[in-house]
Amino acid sequence: MGKKLIGLVKLALNAGKATPAPPVGPALGQYGANIVMFCKEYNARTANKVGLVIPVEISIYEDRSFCFILKTPPAAVLLKKAAQIQSGSGQPNTKKIGSISLQQLEEIAKTKLQDLNTQDVKKAMKIVKGTAKNMGIKIND
């Protein structure tokens, strides 16, 4: 029989920049997990993705050991990077603040595919397109 799971923690952290300070410290500290070891492992595994927010799902076991799974960056972060903007529009229906090409949309959809509830790239593109629309980003055909 495997180890008994005592906690599942989901965090969204900047790649390569996890520190024992909040939010990591309090989230893992309550389970007695080794915070410094997590930070070192996370930073090592995300070193090539600096500048992106990488969500992580941490499973903490009874013996205080842990394992974690890295997810893909949120669609909004990828869209902001592609459109070269700092934040979404306050009025996405009337004020467009950037645009991306159909190829960029497809690349983002392919990146997000493993975390979306579809295996079809066209459907994934529709999901990401909806996020872009809500951010005030125009898709150029």
From Swiss-Prot:
Q: Name one GO cellular component term.
A: chloroplast
GO annotation, biological process: translation
Subcellular locations according to the entry: Plastid, Chloroplast
Q: Give an example GO molecular function.
A: structural constituent of ribosome
Q: What is its main location?
A: plastid
Which of UniProt's keywords are assigned here?
Chloroplast, Plastid, Ribonucleoprotein, Ribosomal protein, RNA-binding, rRNA-binding
InterPro entries assigned = Ribosomal_uL11, Ribosomal_uL11_bac-typ, Ribosomal_uL11_C, Ribosomal_uL11_C_sf, Ribosomal_uL11_CS, Ribosomal_uL11_N, Ribosomal_uL11_N_sf
- Spell out the Pfam families in the cross-references: Ribosomal_L11, Ribosomal_L11_N
Superkingdom as given in the UniProt entry? Eukaryota
What does the UniProt record say this protein does? Answer: Forms part of the ribosomal stalk which helps the ribosome interact with GTP-bound translation factors.
Subunit relationships:
Part of the ribosomal stalk of the 50S ribosomal subunit. Interacts with L10 and the large rRNA to form the base of the stalk. L10 forms an elongated spine to which L12 dimers bind in a sequential fashion forming a multimeric L10(L12)X complex.
Give the similarity note.
Belongs to the universal ribosomal protein uL11 family.
Please report the name of this protein according to its UniProt entry: Large ribosomal subunit protein uL11c
| Classification of source organism | Eukaryota, Rhodophyta, Florideophyceae, Rhodymeniophycidae, Gracilariales
**Gene of this entry:** rpl11
